[in-house]
């Protein structure tokens, strides 16, 4: 496994290289992003030191990046749209990719999608222009692997710790996340993968309860 990872502070445009070693958690700053590799059989832990912070996660088969995480496949195979432990997550080729082993918050959005400049403008008008967003964060994260925006899509994105509600009329609402300080999710890698995570920078809605907070990322020893 390549230990070098790529961490970017999206709010300042500063890029630095970190080393993600098993057993040594890395702090992902508010609005930041990270990319790294994980081997089959290793476990990824994503934690909320302060709670109420959403992460957008995408991942690729390291041996063929055309195969990537799929929320559609994951919902269809599990026959469930509230994916948490002990569910499996699947690729766009419907192969097992992750097993969720622990999930203290037990609240994730599996509909696919991420905030983007175009979406922010459509929803919030001019203030959305050039505002930090998960699409640009994820693109920045994977750039070091020779990939760009066109290597992933909204179906690939697992919105970890995100709370979304539907009412009886079909109204879709983003609500404040339920994560408490110290909550985490642990996922077992079932393929060798390239992983990218955006610490969601959205402040226009309740996704992060209107305050950006750090996350910690760790490959367990």
Predicted features along the sequence, with ranges:
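Acidic, Ser/Thr/Pro
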Residues: 2-221
